[in-house]
Design a protein with these regions (language model features):
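Aromatic-residue-lined binding/catalytic grooves and analogous aromatic/hydrophobic interfacial grooves
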Residues: 1-245
Length: 245
């Protein structure tokens, strides 16, 4: 599974392309999925998926918590299995340091993976840390977090940059904030202390307070078919008002 995280402070020297890929996480499982389903609960802001394999039913859910500034991802399975968590810094070497290019390295630090680098043309530094909580065995091998024989694993990601919103950021196009390393470390410690369920509870309370302000009904009846089934029927020329609404 590939997860992309974006930021709007990695603009290039031409002040274009402000939204950029900050970091990618690859989560690799040692199974083959069947009966795969996925969705997003727009009332709680939680993405979820499930599938069946030789390890039984696997359930995954993820959210980004605004109150705690942390991304949380949980996977649960009926039978113990393995997984790997690998971080990738995109666009390294694509541009030069003066043309919006970035530097970066990934290394193990205190039982976590740390991602650190700079955007020289913007005088910007960035930092991220990835931690895993699991009931299985956990090791760090070649810059990857490896989990074995686990029924449950929680992945936490915290990241930040030295960008500071101030007049100089617009007049000079260069960051004037502080190095984010300590800030990232303290956020991760706080998230680990809260634990997954508390992080989820705080996220839902925050997100739902906004989403529950309005409700609307677009009508129609849901007959239980999946999106791919509806699309196939639609391509065959059948009327599918559920797609058009």
């Amino acid at each position: 599974e590939r997860l992309q995280f974006t930021t709007n402070v990695f603009a290039n020297t031409f002040s274009q392309g402000g939204v950029s890929n900050f970091l990618e996480l690859y989560i690799e499982f040692n199974d083959v999925a069947e009966n795969y389903e996925r969705g997003l609960d727009i009332k709680t802001g939680i993405a979820f998926s499930s599938y069946k394999s030789a390890f039984g039913l696997t359930k995954r859910e993820a959210f980004f918590s605004y109150p705690d500034n942390v991304f949380a991802y949980r996977v649960e399975t009926e039978k113990p299995k393995d997984l790997k968590v690998r971080a990738v810094i995109p666009y390294l070497g694509v541009r030069g340091a003066d043309d919006g290019g970035r530097t970066g390295e990934i290394f193990a630090n205190d039982g976590c993976i740390e991602i650190k680098g700079t955007l020289p043309s913007r005088n910007l530094s960035y930092d991220a840390k990835v931690a895993v909580i699991t009931d299985g065995e956990k090791t760090i091998e070649n810059g990857e977090i490896v989990v074995r024989n686990a029924l449950c694993a929680v992945i936490l990601l915290v990241f930040d940059t030295s960008y500071k919103l101030c007049p100089e950021a617009f007049s000079t196009h260069r960051a004037v904030g502080e190095d984010p390393t300590e800030k990232v470390a303290s956020r991760l410690v706080a998230a680990l202390k809260l634990g997954y369920e508390k992080l989820k509870e705080r996220h839902i309370a925050d997100f739902s307070s906004i989403m529950n302000r309005v409700e609307f009904d677009i009508g129609g009846r849901y007959d239980g078919r999946t999106t791919d089934e509806l699309l196939s029927s639609y391509k065959e020329g059948n009327d599918e008002p559920y797609l058009e609404e």
